[in-house]
């Protein structure tokens, strides 16, 4: 896997896919890697493999599918299931794919790894049915799972609002939503 490229993009979510496809169209030799097995990131997880039940087409499905199709057709060297674990000042990037390690020498690097959900423990957080919004969104996108209509959403950050909109669009109901993002000094 040791090789060189003009641009290495780390992360195959919407930003990474768009950056890689745009650069490739401009003639740049691009390599894109992501730890997941398929492109799309959290927001378009499993978009190529997903079968959505009739009436459960999420608004951004077609945009996500089009972005992945564009990426697949632009000639980018794609390394799925690969983790970057070290970036040197001279832009050597050390990566692992299963039990194999390698080095990629890049002229430029774009880090487009997206946001990370951080679960905050609270009383009852390990009870059945209690999950993070990221886990609930994965279930909606990969299994078309819609929780019961008496679902409560609580937390902060933009993923909560996105999931609430996707859940309603998919025919789900929300009993209550609590957004807690007060800034404190």
Where are these regions (language model features)?
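Conserved small/polar residues in nucleotide/adenosyl-binding loops
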Residues: 178-185
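Flexible loop residues that form catalytic
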Residues: 47, 114, 183
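Short beta-strand to alpha-helix junction loop
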Residues: 51-69, 159, 181
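FAD-binding core/adjacent interface of flavoenzyme oxidoreductases
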Residues: 1-10, 63-150
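Rossmann-like dinucleotide/flavin-binding elements
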Residues: 4, 10-32, 116-178
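Hydrophobic/basic alpha-helical segments enriched in Actinobacteria
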Residues: 13, 26, 82-87, 181
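Conserved N-terminal glycine-rich FAD pyrophosphate-binding loop of Rossmann-like flavoproteins
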Residues: 36-59, 117-129
């Amino acid at each position: 896997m040791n090789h060189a490229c003009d641009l290495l993009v780390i992360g195959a979510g919407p930003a990474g896919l768009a950056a890689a496809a745009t650069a490739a169209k401009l003639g740049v030799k691009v390599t894109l890697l992501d730890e997941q097995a398929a492109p799309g990131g959290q927001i378009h997880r499993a978009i190529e493999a997903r079968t959505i039940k009739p009436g459960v087409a999420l608004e951004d499905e077609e945009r996500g599918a089009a972005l992945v199709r564009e990426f697949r057709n632009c000639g980018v060297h794609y390394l799925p299931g690969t983790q970057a674990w070290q970036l040197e000042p001279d832009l050597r990037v050390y990566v692992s794919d299963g039990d194999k390690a390698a080095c990629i020498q890049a002229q430029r690097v774009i880090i487009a790894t997206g946001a990370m959900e951080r679960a905050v423990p609270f009383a009852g957080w390990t009870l059945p049915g209690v999950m993070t919004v990221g886990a609930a969104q994965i279930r909606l996108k990969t299994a078309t799972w819609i929780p019961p209509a008496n679902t409560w959403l609580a937390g902060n950050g933009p993923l909560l609002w996105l999931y609430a909109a996707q859940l309603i669009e998919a025919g789900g109901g929300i009993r209550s939503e609590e957004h807690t993002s007060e800034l404190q000094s």
